């Protein structure tokens, strides 16, 4: 038998037994698997806070890990290379601890309004976040079609006496202040009317009839509109505060997610898929209007309303 050929009995100074070959193969395989694990990179997001069609295209070695809420994403951020957070939750992070993301060419494809959240609202500096989706806050009503007849009142409907104790407000006081302006009396009245300031649980409170109205980012409601005729959405004509979905990198020198994947959400066919699910990338309004022609008209008008709204 030639040197290097496996023998059955393990004898022979320069030969490898079949058992040795199997052990060596197992050890080599374990090493390869460990190497794969070390090369894996995670994107953390809370459930319902990322477009599933886009996340499904995340290339290897990246993988998506879904958590229950944004607080868990923040708590586990040291374990991940990429985070998905709204601008409200991202504001708790130190921008200096975040690595730049994307490119100037990629950011230039977005509407200019997206540049500020891309810098985490700093007046200048590098792009610290990829603002891949934007959603206005909307008024969501359950079985209150009587209030829809007064939609011209806009956000003043929140102060309707019939909603006292039946209203869910955003967790962020900043949003409530934006809705009521600078009037402290109106803001105090709004807070007294709220059953909770907890938008993560607002839909559950609506569906279980513990609330009749809630202020939520538009995207959270779009899937529900298709299956629950009791739910109606009001986007006041005088506008609304915006909620931005952001991707952020940790401060360690992790590899950046592929630019092709970041850009995919801005282009057909994926762009139309995410629009159907209620996600609206912050592209120029004319381009969004053109793509939205592939949607049912009521959904298109909700997602891409006239530019002055």
Predicted regions and their residues:
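N-terminal secretory signal peptides and thylakoid transit peptides that target proteins
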Residues: 4-29
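Ligand-binding pocket segment of bilobal, Venus flytrap-like solute-binding proteins
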Residues: 76, 87-93, 168-239
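Non-transmembrane alpha-helical segments in soluble domains
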Residues: 22, 156-159, 203, 207, ...
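Short beta-strand->loop
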Residues: 101-110, 129, 226-241, 250-251
């Amino acid at each position: 038998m030639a040197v290097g050929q496996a023998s059955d009995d393990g004898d022979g100074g320069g030969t490898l037994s079949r058992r040795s070959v199997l052990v060596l193969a197992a050890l080599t395989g374990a090493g390869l698997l460990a190497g794969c694990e070390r090369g894996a990179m995670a994107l953390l997001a809370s459930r319902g806070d990322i477009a599933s069609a886009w996340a499904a295209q995340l290339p290897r070695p990246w993988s998506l890990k879904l958590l229950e809420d944004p607080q868990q994403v923040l708590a586990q951020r040291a374990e991940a290379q990429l985070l998905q957070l709204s601008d409200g939750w991202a504001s708790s992070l130190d921008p200096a601890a975040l690595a730049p993301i994307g490119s100037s060419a990629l950011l230039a494809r977005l509407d200019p309004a997206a540049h500020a959240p891309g810098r985490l609202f700093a007046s200048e500096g590098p792009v610290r976040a990829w603002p891949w989706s934007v959603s206005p806050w909307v008024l969501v009503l359950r079985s209150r079609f009587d209030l829809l007849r007064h939609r011209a009142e806009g956000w003043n409907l929140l102060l309707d006496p019939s909603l006292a104790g039946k209203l869910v407000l955003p967790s962020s006081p900043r949003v409530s202040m934006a809705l009521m302006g600078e009037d402290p009396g109106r803001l105090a009245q709004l807070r007294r009317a709220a059953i909770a300031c907890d938008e993560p649980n607002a839909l559950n409170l609506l569906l279980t009839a513990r609330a009749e109205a809630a202020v939520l980012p538009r995207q959270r409601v779009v899937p529900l509109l298709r299956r629950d005729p009791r739910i109606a959405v009001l986007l006041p004509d005088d506008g609304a505060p915006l909620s931005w979905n952001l991707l952020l990198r940790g401060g360690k020198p992790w590899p950046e997610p592929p630019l092709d994947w970041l850009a995919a959400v801005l282009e057909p066919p994926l762009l139309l898929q995410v629009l159907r699910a209620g996600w609206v990338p912050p592209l120029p309004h004319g381009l969004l209007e053109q793509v939205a022609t592939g949607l049912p008209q009521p959904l298109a008008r909700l997602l891409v309303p006239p530019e002055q709204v």
